[in-house]
Design a protein with these regions (language model features):
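Active-site-proximal alpha-helical segments within enzyme catalytic domains
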Residues: 143, 190, 244-251, 290-311, ...
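Short loop/turn microsegments at loop-to-beta-strand junctions
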Residues: 71-73, 132, 366-368
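Active-site helix/loop module of the DD-peptidase/beta-lactamase fold
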Residues: 122-128, 133, 151-195, 227-230, ...
Length: 391
């Protein structure tokens, strides 16, 4: 039986597909003579100046403001290197937290602390900053940073390198031939064969079967992840695994001698003018599976970097080869939309849309970046917020 997208990712994805259809209905983007790089600020434009229907976007803005798309904090559209639509929506999260902390739900499986995504004490977005939890968008950014390190020659290992190379096997549980075969590429493409499935639990992190909540409750996330059983041959099937992405934090540190957050700051975030916060687990390992915080303008820069094949201010940040491989359809996902089957790249979701793939980075609670590559509209749409999972 086919699995539809609505069963497995937040309802806000419907919001982005609606946005995609609005953008696709617009005119082709007018030619630009030169790229204006938004390192300091995004240049401003109007929807009409880039072939989009302003009235449609205004109506969409009203729908967001009136709550049609759950607790949306911001919605922005970028095209031709300009911000052409921006909406920000205010919510009293202190009041929401006071209410939501009394009853468990998908966004607050633990009533206090880091498992409650309404808790202002744990999330910088609520503390007078504009840094917003990215959740599993962090996985996509982890892939980008890995590509930067490979491009620079700092990460020398092949993607076919077994992950166990970076661990003391004598201290790893459940070692079998399949775990020995599990490679870095398997971790990037969610084909590790690990015994972890997260997307079929609409109750979110409150589901007892949901693997990532057990990992995040453990003292050492990487140890939990590497101890996890590998129950099928790696490379055969897509199985979404936050634990697999967390292993990349250890692998990156061992291979480069640097933590991935400090490396990203120097070679990715600083050149693009990106401010960030990247949290760590209890033993100090960078939370590569869900711990990144960015603002909305800076998230859009990452989409723009990929639209420009890894160049920024005409300097090479990540190789064009890595960009193309990252958004190539490596493994079919067991989900479909109207235009066809979804695929997964190197931690990018690939959504069939008008004869090509839109590239999506998506995270729990409605953190989403969708990029529409050329020759169709060269555009990115970004939404951050809170949303329930749909059943």
């Amino acid at each position: 039986m086919k699995k539809t997208l609505g069963r497995v990712i937040p309802v806000v994805s419907l919001f982005l597909f609606t946005a995609a259809s609005l953008l696709a209905a617009g005119q082709a983007a007018p030619p630009t003579s030169a790229v204006t790089w938004p390192t300091k600020n995004w240049p401003k434009g109007t929807p009409a100046s880039v072939g989009l229907d302003e009235e449609t976007l205004k109506n969409f803005d009203v729908d967001i403001a009136t709550g049609k798309y759950a607790l949306t904090d911001s919605f922005r559209v970028f095209r031709c290197g300009m911000e052409v639509f921006a909406g920000r929506y205010q919510h009293d999260y202190a009041q929401i937290y006071a209410k939501e902390s009394k009853t468990k739900g998908p966004l607050n499986a633990r009533l206090t602390g880091s498992y409650n995504y309404f808790d202002p004490e744990w999330h910088p977005f609520y503390q007078g900053t504009d840094l917003h939890t990215m959740q599993s968008v962090s996985k996509t950014v982890t892939s980008i940073v890995l590509g930067v390190a490979i491009t620079r020659g700092d990460f020398k290992a092949s993607l076919n390198t077994p992950g166990l190379k970076y661990f003391d096997v004598a201290r790893v549980k459940n070692v079998n031939d399949w775990k020995r075969q599990m490679t870095i590429e398997n971790l990037l493409t969610m084909t590790s064969g690990m015994n972890s499935e997260e997307l079929f639990y609409p109750e979110g992190s409150d589901a007892p079967e949901n693997d990532f909540v057990h990992m995040e409750a453990s003292d050492d996330w990487v140890q939990y992840a590497i101890d996890e059983p590998v129950v099928e041959e790696p490379g055969r099937n897509f199985t979404y695994s936050s634990a697999g992405t967390e292993l990349l934090a250890r692998i990156f540190q061992k291979e480069t001698g640097q933590d991935i957050d400090s490396y990203a700051e120097r070679y990715l975030f600083a050149p693009l003018g990106i401010r960030h916060h990247w949290k760590r687990d209890y033993v100090g390992t960078v939370d590569t599976e869900g711990g990144l915080y960015l603002n909305d303008e800076d998230l859009a820069k990452l989409g723009f970097l990929y639209l420009n094949n890894g160049l920024w201010e005409n300097k090479r940040i990540v190789s064009e080869y890595w960009v193309k491989q990252s958004v190539a359809p490596h493994v079919p996902m067991p989900y479909t939309v109207e235009d066809g089957r979804l695929y997964y790249g190197f931690s990018w979701w690939l959504i069939p849309s008008n004869g090509q793939y839109a590239w999506m980075a998506t995270g729990f609670g409605g953190q989403e970046l969708m990029v529409f590559p050329r020759p169709k509209p060269d555009c990115s749409v970004h939404r951050v917020g809170r949303s329930e999972w749909r059943n």
